């Protein structure tokens, strides 16, 4: 069975756009760089050629990865999400029970996570602790920096 990869519509569009760019813009640019480096002669000591081949390998690997992710994507329509229990797509406002610092996170797919933008991966320790909880619940998160306790202040959708 192929594991589905949950993601938002925005995350899906970003993957499609990166795939398009890598196939239609980056791939031809790299092929041109390889041809140009080949024209310089001896390939065994041609740093430009080896760098271009390495870039090609990296690009083709990422294309394969993107094609796989897109094929397995399970796009979650956040506009249809509701309820008081936290699940994928929820925007959750928390307060650190020790420091009283408030934080807001949206639970998104692994490929969309960006803590600086307030988007955390569904597979992160904090998201795993939040799933199924409601406003007023407290959670304890065992993260690499140690154990932290949070209270859930709000759950929003969309």
Curated annotation (Swiss-Prot):
GO BP term, example: regulation of DNA-templated transcription elongation
A GO molecular-function descriptor: RNA polymerase binding
Stored InterPro entries: GreA/GreB_C_sf, TF_GreA/GreB_CS, Tscrpt_elong_fac_GreA, Tscrpt_elong_fac_GreA/B, Tscrpt_elong_fac_GreA/B_C, Tscrpt_elong_fac_GreA/B_fam, Tscrpt_elong_fac_GreA/B_N, Tscrpt_elong_fac_GreA/B_N_sf
Keywords: DNA-binding, Transcription, Transcription regulation
Superkingdom: Bacteria
Gene3D superfamilies assigned: Transcription elongation factor, GreA/GreB, C-terminal domain, Transcription elongation factor, GreA/GreB, N-terminal domain
Protein task: Necessary for efficient RNA polymerase transcription elongation past template-encoded arresting sites. The arresting sites in DNA have the property of trapping a certain fraction of elongating RNA polymerases that pass through, resulting in locked ternary complexes. Cleavage of the nascent transcript by cleavage factors such as GreA or GreB allows the resumption of elongation from the new 3'terminus. GreA releases sequences of 2 to 3 nucleotides.
Family per similarity comment: Belongs to the GreA/GreB family.
Protein name listed in UniProt: Transcription elongation factor GreA
Organism phylogeny: Bacteria, Pseudomonadati, Pseudomonadota, Alphaproteobacteria, Hyphomicrobiales
Gene, per the UniProt record: greA
